[in-house]
Amino acid sequence: MEKYDVVAMGELLIDFTQNGYSEQGNPIFEANPGGAPCNVLAMLQKLGRKTAFIGKVGQDGFGLQLEKALKETGISTEGLCFDEEVHTTLAVVQKKEDGDRDFSFYRKPGADMMLRREEVKEDLIRNAKIFHYGSLSLTDEPVRTATVSTIEAAEKAGVWISFDPNLRKPLWAVCCIRF
């Protein structure tokens, strides 16, 4: 088993980002790889760190596009799973007038939410210096249980744990948000 500087777990999705306007004045959207945990891994790869991803995408064109993007970036896909029934999660990203971004998610459910505890390769965690995860993997079952179990495995293995809150309120059930 290889050793990794950082192993991240969470959402891997397609961000449809506005990229200009058509001749008719309609917005043109570009399909880009997205998801906070993988964005972190991509930057770490550029800094020369060895990384791996744990998560789930749909067995669809977008899922295959994301797998290819991870491989091209140098991120290990050993922990990437494919769901044959649920599609890859999509997000439409639009800029507001103040320059901030607005996200509309198509995730009811999305493949990232369907990662099960038994699909997580805990050897990846035990062979990492840092385990990084984001809040979206805590929004729904079964990925919530898979994430909590993986956090516990990292803690038991003495792996440093990094958390990105990245709160997207529309994705949380009211009963789950506690302040």
Sequence positions of predicted segments:
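Glycine-rich phosphate/adenosyl-contacting loop at the front of the ribokinase-like
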Residues: 1-76, 115
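Generic recognition of cysteine residues
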Residues: 38, 81, 175-176
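Conserved N-terminal subdomain of the carbohydrate kinase-like
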Residues: 50-135
